[in-house]
């Protein structure tokens, strides 16, 4: 019986950290890899790559924990989130706080193996991860904070590899914010009706009937900024083809959200994994000359 309870608790932690749903980690991973490949340029040092890949998983898990902790009193009123570990009682508030601290400490121990500039930047990463979940109570633009949180690995990656944060770094950071606002608005469209009822704010609510148009503008902005990064770094045709393919995926997403149906909006959100992958493959093709 004791093992059964322990096993149930571990499964609850597993759900709380979303390790069964890797999409969030992947959306955090792709911009990190973009930055590492551009900063190097090419394949980054193996240890730095390993630190960032592990750090992505740990910080995404920590972000999920603090997000559910912040939303614990709201999630029970939303059909999609009512069975999450905190509102269902499978995990206590104290356990959630402890798990968050453990995950952050593990991530920080990894960062301590890197240079001083990266260590200093990691403090801002922690602040963004902690602040984001609470922003949806005070502003309709929490997705902007999410974009900054998901993109802060970009300046950290540049700092780790080159001890500098050049123009390309900040253009990529901005592109990631635009991309995150676009895909998280698609995600927020799924819960828009529930969010209005319980007082949660989001760009999906703010944009209203213009949501599809604004998402399209943001997606075009991502493509323009990523193309500018390619030009600044002298990347070859393979990279620009990847931007065109990403544009095709954005068009497909627009088709999916055309009628604002919940399942289709969620499918559009999930499709962004392929956008990140395609852009990374374009970078890899440009730097790896066979």
From Swiss-Prot:
It is found in: Cell inner membrane. GO terms for cellular component: plasma membrane. Keywords: Cell inner membrane, Cell membrane, Magnesium, Membrane, Transferase, Transmembrane, Transmembrane helix, Ubiquinone biosynthesis. Catalyzes the prenylation of para-hydroxybenzoate (PHB) with an all-trans polyprenyl group. Mediates the second step in the final reaction sequence of ubiquinone-8 (UQ-8) biosynthesis, which is the condensation of the polyisoprenoid side chain with PHB, generating the first membrane-bound Q intermediate 3-octaprenyl-4-hydroxybenzoate. It holds the Pfam family UbiA. InterPro entries: HB_polyprenyltransferase-like, Prenyltransferase, UbiA_prenyltransferase, UbiA_prenylTrfase_CS, UbiA_sf. GO terms for biological process: ubiquinone biosynthetic process. The chain crosses the membrane at residues 33-53, 99-119, 141-161, 163-183, 213-233, 237-257, 268-288. The keyword Chaperone does not apply. Disulfide bonds: none annotated. It catalyses: all-trans-octaprenyl diphosphate + 4-hydroxybenzoate = 4-hydroxy-3-(all-trans-octaprenyl)benzoate + diphosphate. It comes from Escherichia fergusonii (strain ATCC 35469 / DSM 13698 / CCUG 18766 / IAM 14443 / JCM 21226 / LMG 7866 / NBRC 102419 / NCTC 12128 / CDC 0568-73). The keyword Transcription does not apply. It comes from the Bacteria. Its EC number is 2.5.1.39. It is a multi-pass membrane protein. Belongs to the UbiA prenyltransferase family. Its cofactor is Mg(2+). The lineage of its organism: Bacteria, Pseudomonadati, Pseudomonadota, Gammaproteobacteria, Enterobacterales. This is 4-hydroxybenzoate octaprenyltransferase. Pathway: Cofactor biosynthesis; ubiquinone biosynthesis. One of its GO terms (molecular function) is 4-hydroxybenzoate polyprenyltransferase activity.
């Amino acid at each position: 019986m004791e093992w059964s309870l322990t096993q149930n608790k571990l499964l609850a932690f597993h759900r709380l950290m979303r390790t069964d749903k890797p999409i969030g980690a992947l959306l955090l991973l792709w911009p990190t890899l973009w930055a590492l490949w551009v900063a190097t340029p090419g394949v980054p040092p193996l240890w730095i790559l390993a630190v960032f890949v592990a750090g992505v998983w740990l910080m995404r898990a920590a972000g999920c924990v603090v997000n559910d902790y912040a939303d614990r009193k709201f999630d029970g009123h939303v059909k999609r989130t009512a069975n999450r570990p905190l509102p269902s009682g499978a995990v206590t508030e104290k356990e959630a706080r402890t798990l968050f601290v453990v995950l952050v400490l593990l991530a920080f121990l990894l960062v301590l193996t890197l240079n001083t500039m990266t260590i200093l930047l990691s403090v801002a990463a922690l602040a963004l991860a902690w602040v984001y979940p609470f922003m949806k109570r005070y502003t309709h633009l929490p997705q902007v904070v999410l974009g900054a949180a998901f993109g802060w690995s970009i300046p950290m990656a540049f700092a780790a590899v080159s001890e500098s944060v050049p123009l390309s770094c900040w253009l990529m950071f901005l592109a990631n914010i635009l991309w995150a606002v676009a895909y998280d608005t698609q995600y927020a469209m799924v819960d828009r009706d529930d969010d209005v009822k319980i007082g949660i704010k989001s760009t999906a609510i703010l944009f209203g009937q213009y949501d599809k148009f604004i998402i399209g503008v943001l997606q075009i902005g991502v493509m323009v900024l990523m193309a500018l990064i390619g030009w600044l770094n002298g990347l070859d045709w393979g990279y620009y083809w990847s931007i065109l393919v990403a544009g095709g995926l954005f068009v497909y997403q627009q088709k999916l959200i055309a009628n604002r149906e919940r399942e289709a909006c969620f499918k559009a959100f999930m499709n962004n994994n392929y956008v990140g992958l395609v852009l990374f493959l374009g970078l890899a093709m440009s730097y790896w000359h066979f």
